């Protein structure tokens, strides 16, 4: 297994949806190229912002195939492969490995709540065993507010002890920085990515590997200026864009602004059960974004 280079500013890239409810791979890939050319060190494909859990196994495999055929550098792409059904998670993770993605981001199997750490351990054990011939790095996706199941620090330690470098890191969408710091302290090689640009100062200092952020779809250039040169004004603007969605639905909000930024109204489509951003919220987000962008970073 080669060492994954994933670090820095990683956008949890949105997935374009066409009028029939299918992923629009061409539009998604155009955004991927734009983001990689404008500040992103990497991309997280088919995560929460990418609506991966709203897409079928067939659709997710098709999106992965499109990325693999695109010529984009898969060594910079992490792909969501978690699923409620273990066989689906194994299939997705194995396909990601065969295609050459840099890592597989694995949600816990999220339907049953209150399951034991032993059950979650067994899930990762099965995925790791099934992909042993092509040992893609596994990144744990910690988002208990959505999944209802945490990757507890003690369990992560157990996984590291059992599977070594296969357990490469963690995306932490909990917002609990104490947890993120504790997880980051488990091993020097265990890469932790909080899900907010606010963690970039600690990433620059070496505590975290970077961030994996939904709003990096919109502000990656600003995040990159801070991450690479310590430009505090750029980070302040990046955070101002993120804060436009405080108390609002994040994924519809990001997609509404993508429609505005790229002048492509179809970007505002979301897959059920999500709904497009309300008109008043969309107007406010656009006005707020334009106001932030009007303040040039020196």
Residue spans of the language-model regions?
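Catalytic alpha/beta core domains of metabolic enzymes, predominantly
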Residues: 128-136, 143-249
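Soluble or luminal CAZymes and related metallo-dependent hydrolases
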Residues: 27, 59, 119, 175, ...
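Solvent-exposed, flexible loop/coil residues
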Residues: 21, 59, 181, 274, ...
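Short, conserved catalytic or adaptor-binding loops enriched in Gly and charged residues
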Residues: 2, 161-162, 262
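C-terminal alpha-helical cap/extension of soluble enzyme domains
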Residues: 11-14, 38, 207-208, 215-298
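A general structural signal for well-ordered alpha-helical segments in protein cores
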Residues: 28, 60, 64, 89, ...
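Active-site beta->alpha loop and helix N-cap motifs at the rims of alpha/beta catalytic domains
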Residues: 2-148, 167
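Alpha-helical scaffold segments in soluble metabolic enzymes
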Residues: 34, 66, 126, 158, ...
